[in-house]
């Protein structure tokens, strides 16, 4: 199906500012859109942390939060007020601050970060809720949510009810501060196949709700930091394992370079694990003294996250395509996103009716994933722009018997017919894609779908954008097409039959085909009464008759006398 180019309403133009894509909005609209998204994120954040309910998928929340920061930077707005997870209203001080972790974009960034650092280790980035565990005199004294990194909520009563978290410790751990991730225990979780499962929200919900002690049995703990613990990493891991924090030792590997990090990352992505992950964390064994830890200043560790299974993408335009059968399909053009190493710039929405039900306009944020064979798929609309400027769909008068001849209103269906006849299902014109057909039609103003047969080699060579080699190839392809069988030419004319049914009919000429009755067509494979009637309508169509006469004049096999 070809794009209805004239209907491409790209109301959002984009420019680059400090490497980020910025919407070219007037100041008033920019302020309004930012305020609306900021409020929505704040509402979701409040529900999430106060009620333990996730109103939106974790990944969507994270991506929209990043989008908000991007917009704020575009207009020079302070980003300090951006909603964060969790909220800043915890009152219990952390004995050691949570530093957070720097995110690395790709392997090149990992290589750069590792350069000059030694004694490096990699761990899975367990997806859950961060916590501080404080042990005093061999007993769990306090458990504090991450909060803003300096202070958080007192979770001690809940944490005491989680069987997997040791309530007593000995030796160096008898008086220790540990930081880790409370996670949802899984059996054989394969991240690549099963995804994130909204694990973070589920854990938060369990910790926030009251009277759910039995649900806490499904939670586990992964310790990723022991501030002021043993300087030797193997010793640190060994002591944690003896104390009951065995997962840390099992899933902490020494690495020397980015290749080893990548190998571990891929292995944990595709292997069965006891928890959900969203990447890996690389850390130095040598850490500063705990008194120097500050939020946002943990330069001794970094994360390399997995690419999200679905990406939030901004709709830049709504376009309409008309297929050879006349069916109108709506396509959303996107500000490009990367999914599984694939650059996604458009997604098929479906029919006009479906588009209207989705209520998608330029400026909206939609969630896009890859379906079978890497085809982009629209999953949901996650944020709607305040302005709802939508294009008007083309008239719906197109059908399977329209646009064999070119006209202003037939532009897109006509191009679709050219693309079809050049495909391997019809004449097999190698090298003739949509762009080539558009160039030829725009230059030489085809009258009908077979007008290209009358082009000379000089005309093809003079088509803008056609190099000498390409024009010669097209000239050869057009000449070879003249030798194609009658059946293939009929397929190129879009007879409403399968190729198998057409072969079974035994027709080898237009004259034979005209003599066939509806009863004859009904007896062919996969051809019932309805399709047989469509064949008769196709055969009797004035444009089809005119094309058959033109092909006869061109001495195409099966059409001449």
Swiss-Prot record:
Belongs to the NAD-dependent DNA ligase family. LigB subfamily. Its EC number is 6.5.1.2. This is DNA ligase B. SUPFAM superfamilies: DNA ligase/mRNA capping enzyme, catalytic domain, Nucleic acid-binding proteins, RuvA domain 2-like. PANTHER family: DNA LIGASE, DNA LIGASE B. One of its GO terms (molecular function) is DNA ligase (NAD+) activity. Catalyzes the formation of phosphodiester linkages between 5'-phosphoryl and 3'-hydroxyl groups in double-stranded DNA using NAD as a coenzyme and as the energy source for the reaction. The lineage of its organism: Bacteria, Pseudomonadati, Pseudomonadota, Gammaproteobacteria, Enterobacterales. The keyword Ligase applies. GO terms for biological process: DNA repair; DNA replication. NCBIfam families: PRK08097.1. The keyword Nucleus does not apply.
């Amino acid at each position: 199906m070809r794009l209805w180019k004239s209907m491409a309403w790209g109301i959002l133009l984009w420019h680059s500012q400090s490497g980020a894509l910025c919407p070219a909005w007037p100041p008033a609209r920019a302020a309004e859109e930012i305020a609306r998204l900021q409020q929505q994120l704040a509402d979701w954040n409040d529900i999430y942390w106060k009620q333990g309910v996730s109103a939106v998928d974790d990944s969507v929340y994270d991506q929209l939060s990043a989008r908000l920061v991007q917009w704020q930077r575009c207009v020079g707005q302070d980003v300090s007020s951006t909603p964060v997870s969790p909220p800043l209203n915890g009152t219990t001080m952390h004995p050691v601050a949570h530093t957070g972790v720097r995110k690395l974009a790709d392997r090149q960034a990992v290589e750069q970060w590792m350069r000059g650092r030694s004694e490096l280790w990699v761990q899975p980035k367990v997806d859950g809720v961060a916590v501080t565990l404080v042990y005093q005199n061999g007993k769990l004294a306090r458990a504090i949510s991450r909060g803003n990194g300096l202070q958080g909520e007192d979770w001690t009563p809940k944490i005491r009810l989680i069987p997997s978290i040791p309530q007593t410790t000995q030796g160096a751990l008898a008086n220790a501060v540990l930081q880790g991730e409370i996670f949802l225990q899984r059996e054989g979780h394969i991240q690549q196949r099963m995804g994130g499962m909204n694990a973070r929200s589920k854990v938060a919900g369990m910790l926030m709700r009251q009277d759910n002690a039995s649900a806490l049995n499904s939670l586990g703990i992964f310790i990723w930091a022991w501030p002021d613990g043993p300087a030797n990493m193997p010793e640190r891991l060994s002591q944690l394992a003896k104390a009951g924090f065995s997962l840390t030792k099992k899933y902490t590997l020494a690495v020397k370079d980015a290749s080893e990090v990548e190998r571990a990352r891929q292995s944990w992505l595709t292997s069965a694990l006891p928890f959900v992950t969203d990447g890996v964390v690389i850390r130095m064994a040598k850490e500063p003294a705990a008194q120097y830890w500050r939020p946002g200043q943990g330069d001794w560790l970094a994360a390399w996250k997995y690419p999200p299974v679905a990406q939030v993408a901004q709709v830049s335009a709504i376009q309409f395509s008309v297929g050879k059968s006349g069916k109108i399909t709506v396509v959303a053009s996107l500000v490009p996103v990367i999914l599984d190493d694939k650059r996604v710039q458009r997604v098929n929405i479906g029919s006009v009716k479906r588009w209207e039900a989705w209520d998608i306009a330029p400026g909206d944020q939609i969630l896009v994933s890859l379906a079978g064979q890497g085809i982009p798929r629209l999953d949901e609309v996650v944020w709607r722009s305040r302005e709802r400027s939508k294009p008007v769909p083309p008239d719906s008068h197109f059908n399977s018997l329209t646009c064999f001849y070119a006209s202003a209103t037939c532009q897109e269906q006509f191009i679709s017919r050219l693309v079809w006849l050049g495909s391997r299902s019809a004449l097999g014109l190698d090298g003739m894609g949509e762009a080539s057909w558009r160039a030829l039609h725009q230059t030489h103003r085809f009258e009908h779908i077979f007008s290209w047969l009358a082009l000379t080699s000089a005309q093809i060579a003079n088509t803008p954008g056609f190099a000498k080699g390409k024009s010669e190839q097209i000239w050869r392809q057009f000449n070879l097409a003249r030798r194609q069988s009658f059946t293939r030419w009929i397929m190129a004319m879009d007879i409403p039959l399968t190729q198998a049914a057409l072969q079974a009919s035994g027709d080898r000429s237009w004259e034979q085909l005209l003599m066939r009755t509806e009863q004859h067509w009904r007896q062919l494979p996969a051809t019932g009464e309805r399709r047989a009637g469509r064949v008769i309508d196709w055969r009797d169509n004035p444009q089809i008759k005119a094309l058959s006469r033109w092909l006869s004049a061109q001495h195409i096999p099966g059409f001449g006398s």
